[in-house]
Amino acid sequence: MKKVYVLIGNYGSGKTELALNFAFRAAEQGKRTELLDLDMVNTYFRLTERGKMTEMKEIRLVSPNFACSGIETLSVPAEVASAFAMDWDTVIFDVGGDAVGATAVGRYHQDFMELEEGALEVLNVVNVRRPLAGTVERIEKLQEEMQIHARLRITGMINNTNLAGMTTDAELRDGYELIREVSQRTGVPVAYTSGKKEFLDRFLAEGHDPKYIGTPLAIDTYMQRDWDSWIHSLSDNPSNPRPGVYYRTDMA
């Protein structure tokens, strides 16, 4: 049975990193894999920039037109239809970073509904250190909005709480506490807890309730960035509609 993962979440939650990890893991298991970049909101993290890596692993990558050209008006390619029409084992969608971004995947509602029962997982990637995800109420609100715009029911959450190079043991623990409460209030289960192996191992050793951990997922980092340089470039660009918004860590 074809397995389709739709990864959605707020800015800086780590969707793209997880999408790559999901795809690489599937390919290493010998599965025919397609990876689709539908993030029409955040042009900073583009799967296209890892095109050589995906090609080496025989993963088909579908990206927005002009994704690496510096042109900010992106359009969804017609090749997205291949996710449903072709005989893949694993398909991963990396979807835009807010309710508006989730709209890009909403146009394929009928295609998703025609998938075999159990084939689709819609996963909300949550990083409680990022904007709009620092409280239970914020996580719930964004989750509800994304479901409406994506026209898909979220089937699980991923605790991917981190602060990039400043991550400590506190991140996954704090994410666990908030996401556990969201799960209790909404009924949406925690499907995965993800992070670098050293942090994940120490978190798991603390003995938290496995119901709110889901499947532990140790991830590798592929999307390296010079955060300070990028933040300055956003602030200096008058055409940027959200200067500094994506990457502030003091808003949680």
Q: Language-model segments: what does each one mean?
A:
Residues 100-213, 226:
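Conserved catalytic-core segment of NTP-binding enzymes
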Residues 25-79:
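N-terminal phosphate/diphosphate-binding loop that engages ATP/GTP or pyrophosphate donors
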Residues 15:
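Conserved lysine of the Walker
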Residues 18, 22:
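Hydrophobic positions on the alpha1 helix immediately C-terminal to the Walker A/P-loop
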Residues 87-91, 120-121:
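Loop/turn-to-beta-strand initiation segments
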Residues 11:
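The conserved Walker
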Residues 7:
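Hydrophobic anchor at the beta1->P-loop junction of P-loop NTPases
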Residues 64-69, 89-105:
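Switch II (G3) loop of P-loop NTPases
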